[in-house]
Amino acid sequence: MTIHFYTFSNVRGGSSRQRAFRISEELERRGFSTIIHTPPVVDIARTPWPKKFRLIIQILRTLPSIKKDDIVFLQRAIYSKYFFVIMVLYLSLTRRRMIFDIDDPLYLHSFTKTKVFTQMATAVITCSHGEMEWAKKYNAQVSCIHIALTMSDYEKFSNPHEQKNTPVTIGWIGTGPEHIENLKVLAGIFARLARTHGEAFRFVLIGALGDSRVYDIFNTIANLEVSFIDTLDWANPESAPREIQKFDIGVLPHQTDGEWNKAKTSFKILEYMACAVPTIVSSFGEMPYIITDGENGFIAENEDDWVEKLERLIADDALRARIGRAGQERVREAYSFDATIPQYIKVIES
């Protein structure tokens, strides 16, 4: 049996890297045969004609390699109508087993394609409980398996909590231009903190990508010391944890309104926690399943809550160490590949 992955993007895309390429590697280590087919679906969608025709032919040529007992694994593969039609026809004619993986509430903007793949799937894997509840309307075989990470890549960059940093470093990492509205959540919080604790903390934002909108959110806040790192080598598994290790506090501001946010989750929260960095998150989506407030992290319900919990962490070295270590243990037990790959294997073998 071989598992045939068709992915949203190449390995440089975070979703496909963690939900397909890394899964493939981990399954191979455990004796499974896997293959990742190219081109990625998003390349088909974005490539103009007549070059698009060549990519479609490439996909068609992969289909004869899928044998009777093999499994087709579609990772977020809804972004090309041509790929969608090809795969629907192929699966309908051959009755091959198919696993459909979604890590965002894709049904909110691509309802029909997401619904059809969900209905056709032998099994569906979602990344949040909100997505799982939606998928269960159309398929009984649904598992919630959260995006995971390789724990060893992060543990060696654990924040040691051995010395007091002055000022305390509050950090955020991500693709800044994609999170403008989420980052704006921090603006009012930092403005209040900077008025009373301006010399006690600094802010580091990784992933600004040279976008002036990201810079402007924070450069206008009086008394706020802020540093921007435009980009990292995201394909290098050590680049992010090496920088996160320097954070004393990790923050994940996020909008909370709307169906999209109710079903969302985050990878960066796991990266903070895996490096033993105490974390504060907005109350959205999957966060209450990951964090127990006050035990392995903090969940902030509103701006006042953010300010109060940041003040506590800024002032208390021992609290930062305790929360950071508890968060790291939480990721090790539930959100590392050692924890999630057995769940994938159970789906594959069922």
Language-model regions, residue ranges each:
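A short, well-ordered alpha-helix in the C-terminal region of glycosyltransferases
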Residues: 312, 319-334, 343-346
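Acidic anion/phosphate-binding donor-loop and adjacent secondary structure
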Residues: 108, 149-167, 181, 350
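Short hydrophobic beta-strand element within catalytic cores of glycosyltransferases
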Residues: 250-252, 271-274, 278-281
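Nucleotide-activated donor-binding/catalytic signature segment of Leloir-type glycosyltransferases, i.e.
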Residues: 207, 215-245, 249
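Conserved donor-binding/catalytic core segment of Leloir-type glycosyltransferases
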Residues: 4-5, 162-191, 203-204
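A short, active-site helix/loop in glycosyltransferases that binds the activated sugar's phosphate group
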Residues: 108-110, 114-142, 151-156
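Short acidic/histidine- and often glycine-rich active-site loop of Leloir-type glycosyltransferases
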Residues: 262-263, 283-294, 298-299
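Conserved acidic donor-binding segment of nucleotide-sugar-dependent glycosyltransferases
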Residues: 293-304, 312-318
